[in-house]
Each structure stands twice: as C-alpha cells, then as structure tokens.
Amino acid sequence: SVSAEFMLTRFLGLGVTVGGQWLIVVEALKAQAICARTYAWRQIQGNAYSKYGAHVDDSTNYQVYNNTNTFESTDTAVNETFGQLLAYEGEPIEAFYYSTSCGHSTDGSVWGADPAGTPYLRAVSIDENAKELSLSSNEEFKAFIQNENSGAYDADAAMFRWQTTTDSTILSEKIGGVGRITGLTVTERGPGGIARTLKVVGTEGSKTFSSQSKIRTILGNPSLVYTRNADDTITGWDTLPSAFIYIENEGTDENQVTKFTIYGGGYGHGAGMSQNGAQGRGKTGK
C-alpha cells in the first residue's frame, strides 16, 4: 500500500538500523528496501497484533522505529523498487537481515527450525565466491575468525572482527550451580561455524546451553569491553554481538579467577542479508 511505502522511507532513514555510512551506496539501500518491504508484507499477512489494530510493534521484537526524517537516498531506494518483494517459488520469503557478518552466513536452523523450511537462507561466504566453508570444528573456526583478511564484502565494518575478555566472576552472575567456572567450550557448531551449544565446566559440575541467542545472553555482560575491527573499543552491551565465536581459556590467577578471551565476528544472528555486506558489495559496483 501507499502507507506501507511511506513508512519504508522513514524506516530506511533510521540510523539505528542502517547507520550513516550505509547511506553512501544506493544499490545497497535498494536491497534493504526490498527486504524491509517483504518483511512488512509477511507481518501484515501474519496479523499477529490484530487485537491491537496493528501488525508489528516498534521494539526489537519486530522493527525499532524512532520517527526519524527521510533522506533523498532512502526515498530513491524505496521509489525505484516500488512494489518489489523477494520470493521463492512464487511466495514472498521470510526476509531476514542483520547488521554485519563474520565473513560467512548461517541458515534457518539458527532459530532451531528445520532449514528445509527456508531453503533460501543459505550458509555461504560473504564474498564473490558465495560458497559454504567447512567451519564445523573449533580448530577450523579459530583459524577463520582470527583471519582478518578474508576478502569478505563487509571486512571494513567495525564489528567484522571483535574480541573481549571475561572471567569466572563475571560469568557467575548469569551461570549458577556449577561452582567456580573453570572452562568454556563450544561443543557444537551450526552451518557457517555459529556456536550452537556451549558447555560450561565448574568445580562442582557442568551445564550445557543451546541456541545462539542463549549463548549470547549467558556470555554477555554490560561490563565487557570489546575491541573492534576499527581498533577502538565499546562497552555496555547486555549480550554478545554474535554467536560466531571462538573461546580461549587464559588460565586461573592467584585469586582463583579464570579468564577467557572470546574472539568473535559480526553483529546479529547471521541469517539472510548482511547490511554491511550489501554495502561492501555495492561499493564494488555489484
């Protein structure tokens, strides 16, 4: 509808989602416009908020919206893709997107669903090859995540590579029942190397946590300081930026505090379109 197209121009102007630098490449904005329009269409059809006279809310449950102004570039992106949707076998898809990749995407199993239900969500490298890499072991993923020269489209994005240090005291704020925490190990990885299960070992037992969202939550803490790809730091996040992680045990000090370094990449769930990947690809003229 016309109202939906108008709201897309406001949505694409939203710095929270796109970021100022994203406004540079109009082709990337067009890709975002089509994804957002398809997402909106699916929510309208789902009608989950019918009792409120709405289709979505303006939280992270659906799409954050801060009533910002539009830009000429965002208006152009919406107008030049007017009415276009992403479809698979004639049906509009679940058009997922996220901020930044680690250089590889994952598939629909990231939310615990059968990936056969979303065959268009594929685990591939975010570069000109677009092939699935073997990243199922910790050794393979360690080599991948510690390589900053992968040739990925979003390699210049601030969150393409990041690392942080946590310890057993910080972790105990969210993880109890295992005593003093002495070990963290990713025991299963999904397509693209995303952490699927995490084993936490302590002096009095162990626990296993499953799903990327749960792993990001229990390992995250607002006190953690992240060193990012741009060699600056950021702090204050409740959860890890992504579950594309490798963890190294740094040993236990004289106070019996065990430290861990988390090497990570990307920001978001990793399924669908990387917004910064689209930006990087747009810069190449593709």
Where are these predicted regions, by residue range?
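Conserved, single-site charged/polar hotspot
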Residues: 1-286
